[in-house]
Amino acid sequence: MWMQELWHKEKVIIGMLHLDALPGNPRYSAGDSLDTIIEHARMDLKALINGGVDAVLISNEFSFPYQRKMDFVTVACMARIIGEIKKDITVPFGVDAISDGAATLELARAVDADFCRGTFSGVYVGDGGFYNNDISKLLRRKTELHLSDLKMLYFINPESDINLDTRELVEIAKSTVFKTGADGLCISASAAGQDVNETLIRSVKDACPTIAVLANTGCRPDTIESKLKYADAAVVGTYFKKGGKLQDDDGNNIRVDVNRVKEFMGVVDQFRKG
């Protein structure tokens, strides 16, 4: 599997690097500074790497509410931030321009990301309204951008949205892999930080044994071993932050706590040793 080729290990842990609200986002105020956002990103990156994660996934987590077609300024700011901190990235990294698959691919091209994550296929409805992802256009765009080495991790049950496809998730997973050649499938709960169903992870892995299956939410030291019994990797965001919270009472991004990362990775290392 490509994960072993990229990381030379099994049961990979991908740490989320959540960017602060960016210029043009509702939570960005006139007094905010892009230089400060860059410094915050650098701090979180160092905490994740020093804590021992295997990879980093950079997203515009605080661009609430998310756009189906992202403003150019948001993508441009993400590219600048990643460019500023890239020399400090010593592990494979990915990008997620949330809810905009085309922007995610173009950002990946600009910063030479190893992988990307996104809602690339399917039809969903949620707080942001109705959206239909045209995977045919996205994969053709990927070809145009010469991104044959870029690995794509697909949400098949995105957080906070309802899939209008009434088939069982396992059937959706199988057809997604067959039609798109997905490199990985992300299994989520209903919201960030919520515990993902381990039975669902196992069912998808059994149905798609040659495809990387990732536990995408709710991974903590007391739950990660049971998830990694079936998942090939896990994406961890909320737990790594100070106090295990996504944001403070004012809606601001909370920084990554290196000690929480080390604690978590210690459990994972023991699990890997069997």
Each predicted region: which residue ranges?
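Alpha-helix-loop-beta-strand connector modules within alpha/beta enzyme cores
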Residues: K9-E10, G15, Q67-V95, N133-Y154, ...
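Catalytic cores of alpha/beta
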Residues: V95, D100-A113, E171-A173, A207-P209, ...
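Conserved anion-binding
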Residues: L22, A103, L107-G184
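N-terminal amphipathic alpha-helix/helix-capping segment at the start of soluble metabolic enzymes
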Residues: M1-L34, L139, T143-E144
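Active-site mouth loops of central-metabolism enzymes
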Residues: H18-M43, F93-D100, Y154-V170, C219-R220
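Hydrophobic faces of well-ordered beta-strands that scaffold small-molecule active sites
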Residues: I13-L17, V56-I58, F93-D96, C116-G118, ...
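Glycine-rich, proline-tolerant flexible connector loops at the mouths of alpha/beta enzymes
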Residues: I49-C77, V123-D127, A182-D195, G244-D249
